[in-house]
Amino acid sequence: MNFPTVPAIQKSFQEREAHPAFGYFDPTDEYFDSIIRWQEKRNGVTGLTKEAIGYENGVLGCVSSALQAFSAPGEAILVHSPTYIGFTHVLEENGRKIVHSQLKRDERGIWRMDYEDMDRRLKENRIHLAIFCSPHNPCGRVWQREEIEAAMEVYRKNDCIVISDEIWSDLILEG
């Protein structure tokens, strides 16, 4: 299916093309306001401020920055398995030890987190940083609110910082 682009989009491209630099940018108030409004409208998040929003150029760059800020080379990081290969590469490139908590399929074939396994691995490996992916990549599982809350309680009890990758959450549909 082929159709013409809306004139406003063409105009925006032309305006951007006239700008002398195509690289980095300084986030504007409008940039932050749009994120704050979207989070409130889409996810019911209230109280979000400009100061709480960081700019990163992609999920893996953000994960790398968070790893460097909140952990040291050689430290163990918890991830669910199967694991997004991008997380594996970033963890290895940053010299972190990967500890997997295996997702399990229930009797209906639905992937489930094993909270007891998560808790045990966090304790045994003295883990204080985990990567959580919602919806999960690569299995595609959209976690239910109760499951996310249970996982966050396990992390909280273990004083574990969570890097939460929710890049595809806007594609979740009701039902």
Set out the residue ranges of the language-model regions.
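Short beta->alpha connector loops at strand-helix junctions that form conserved
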Residues: 81, 100-106
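A short helix-loop-beta submotif of the ANL/AMP-binding
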Residues: 93-99
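Active-site phosphate-binding strand-loop segment of PLP-dependent enzymes
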Residues: 105-174
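N-terminal small-domain helix-loop-helix segment of the aminotransferase-like
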Residues: 1-58, 65
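Conserved PLP-anchoring active-site segment centered on the Schiff-base-forming lysine
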Residues: 69-91
